[in-house]
A protein has these predicted regions:
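Sliding clamp-binding short linear motifs
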Residues: 1-131, 197-199, 207
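Single-stranded nucleic-acid-binding OB-fold domains
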Residues: 30, 103-208
Length: 208
């Protein structure tokens, strides 16, 4: 409440405040992000009502409904914080970066046990040597961060997805037969295990 009141006369719009909440910039204010996102519209409305009262010096239309808290106060609702994956998703959406950690960090040990490749090694693959090369068969445990669908000449659907682990990201081409058979898997935010063939071409980024 105090932050919103101080910013009331500044050029701080609703989207700017919500962005600050989502990326964690306001975590030090004593409430969790879910609480702040829920409360911000109510606080804004209350501050606007208070401002109008001060201007008018009397009750008016905006005072018709009694406030749950006296002027100058706000009672924060009791809400549990969002789960970590949702917090990370919002951070990435707002800043382009994960700030609290990485959603794939908890899967690193599993990826190692499964003998999975990592995106750093795949991106650095050499056509003629190294751990991985063109046409190498690889497994990649990853989170899907982007899905771009395309209709082919045969009127089937394929997809280009961005697969990410703690080391970076790589593009994965999902051909029609696989995409149509497993469409539900290829959704942003899903953690999946990909079995694919590496494609390495000169002057192009490696892809699966």
């Amino acid at each position: 409440y105090s932050f919103c009141k101080r910013m009331q006369d500044k050029e701080f719009n609703k989207r700017a405040v919500e962005s600050l909440i989502k990326c964690g910039a306001l975590d030090g204010l004593g409430a969790n992000r879910r609480q702040m996102l829920y409360a911000f519209p109510e606080i804004s409305a209350q501050l606007e009502n208070d401002r109008r009262r001060n201007i008018d010096g009397q009750l008016g239309f905006f005072d018709a409904a009694p406030s749950e808290a006296p002027q100058g106060e706000y009672r924060m609702p009791t809400l549990e914080e969002m789960d970590k994956r949702e917090l990370l998703r919002l951070e990435k959406e707002m800043t382009g970066l994960y700030l609290m950690g990485h959603p794939m960090a908890e899967y690193e040990q599993l990826a190692e046990c499964l003998g999975c490749a990592n995106t750093a090694d795949l991106r650095n693959a050499d056509e003629v040597g190294g751990i991985y090369k063109d046409e190498s068969r690889v497994d990649l445990l990853c989170i899907i961060t982007n899905v771009r669908k395309k209709i082919t000449k045969n009127n089937t659907t394929m997809a280009f997805i961005t697969a990410e682990d703690v080391f970076g990201s790589i593009e994965v081409i999902v051909f029609p037969k696989i995409y149509e058979r497993q469409t539900q898997l290829f959704t942003e935010g899903n953690v999946i295990l990909i079995h694919g063939r590496l494609s390495v071409r000169e002057d192009e980024e490696a892809k699966l």
